[in-house]
């Protein structure tokens, strides 16, 4: 008997159920970083500054269901806007699947371990500062972090022996 392929290998993003869609999030936190756009080049510049609702220890939104009330410009990812979100990290599951790639080896759906993103060193856990730390939003430019956007989707995953 042939084993069934996982849902992300058999369904398009638009065909996924809400729980399947939500489970694609690996909890890296990279989408919760404050970014700036270079007015001259249009380049997106990420920083090590996170959204006020981001829990830096858990790498999750503190109020996900109601986040738009506090952060009106928070972008909700959908199968219909993912292609317009070029600022998403190349290792993001939503972006990778949209581009026809598979999930990274370190993704929790692949490993079965919800901590695998952190163990693989892909998340921003405890590496950022809250946007609430600044009086002037432009001060976040002192924390530019282009290194965080490198593609880590094909990185090997070698879990530590327990």
Curated annotation (Swiss-Prot):
**Pfam entry (one):** CxxCxxCC
Out of the domains of life, which is the source? Answer: Bacteria
Name the family. Answer: Belongs to the UPF0260 family.
HAMAP family xref list: UPF0260
Q: What is this protein called?
A: UPF0260 protein CCNA_03385
């Amino acid at each position: 008997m042939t084993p069934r392929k996982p849902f992300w290998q058999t369904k398009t993003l638009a065909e996924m159920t809400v729980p399947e869609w939500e489970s694609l999030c690996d909890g890296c936190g990279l989408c919760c970083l404050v970014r700036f756009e270079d007015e001259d080049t249009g380049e997106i510049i990420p920083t090590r500054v996170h959204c006020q609702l981001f829990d830096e220890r858990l790498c999750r939104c503190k109020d996900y269901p109601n986040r738009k009330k506090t952060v009106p410009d928070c972008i909700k990812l959908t199968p219909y806007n993912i292609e317009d979100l070029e600022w998403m990290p190349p290792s993001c599951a939503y972006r990778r699947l949209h581009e026809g790639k598979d999930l990274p080896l370190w993704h929790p759906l692949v490993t079965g371990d919800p901590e695998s993103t952190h163990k693989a060193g892909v998340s921003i856990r405890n590496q950022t500062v809250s946007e609430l730390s600044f009086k002037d939003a432009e001060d976040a430019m002192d924390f530019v972090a282009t290194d965080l956007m490198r593609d880590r989707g094909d990185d090997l995953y070698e879990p530590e022996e327990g």
